[in-house]
Amino acid sequence: MDIESKKFLGQPKNFVSIFNALLFDGQPVLKPEYLKDENSELVMNVSSKHVDIIKRYEDGTYLDLFVIESQSYVDPSMVARVMEYESVARMRYIRQNFKKHVPMHTRLPMILTVVLYVGESKWNAAKRLSELEIIHPGFEDMFNEFKLNLIELNTNHKYNTGEKATQDFFDLLRMIYRKQVLKEDLDREFNRDALYFAYVVTKNKELLSIYQKSEKGDVKVCRALDEMFEESTNKGIQMGIKQGIEQGIALNQFEVYQTMLDKGFSIKTIASIFSVSEESIEKMLIKI
């Protein structure tokens, strides 16, 4: 997923839209033309800390994007990992730019980190340092809080990115994970790159099939997904009916066997009457 992640989210307009979605409700405060790739020693050293994409903004701000893969895990230590990365990044910057010490009144570039969680399961790990560490009574005022800038695409929250490609990607994941297509989206056309990246993340074969059938341009997706969700729901209903019938038959047999036992019939006699094994009767009586 790493290659596709960098390919899709690394595009300047897509990259800034993630930050605009979280910070400015999709308003184009951050501009893609002010971004530049950061290829310095800093990136070489901190990329091992699992930062997927690092870019510099015009004013020197570092914008960093963590992408948490759907098939991997929810990392309980994510808060600590982000803190570690930012600390390493700041110290690297200081060493690169100041020989002995930092001059008085110097201000370092801001490091803004966003964690984009694209998994299906609920994010149940800490979102704040206070949720990860034990804070003893009386120490609350001395504790330095730290929180994740976390975007979760499997929740009911609808993020506005202000950019079609990332908005389409966000909404596709919500549809797949919630197994629901809104009526107003049935004829909506989705960005083809967003469609493919959604497939890479979810491994949904229907998305891949739709992608392969389309050659270029935007793609209609929702009617096929809606049919897939409906078929899945119907299969679940049929399975439930089948299980209910089987349980009903088993319960009826149990009641018959129990009534005969109450009337003094032995298990051996009951087995002979119904042409079943004694073991099957005993198992049913124990199970139910």
Question: Model regions: which residues?
Answer:
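Elongated, amphipathic alpha-helical interaction scaffolds
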Residues: 1-288
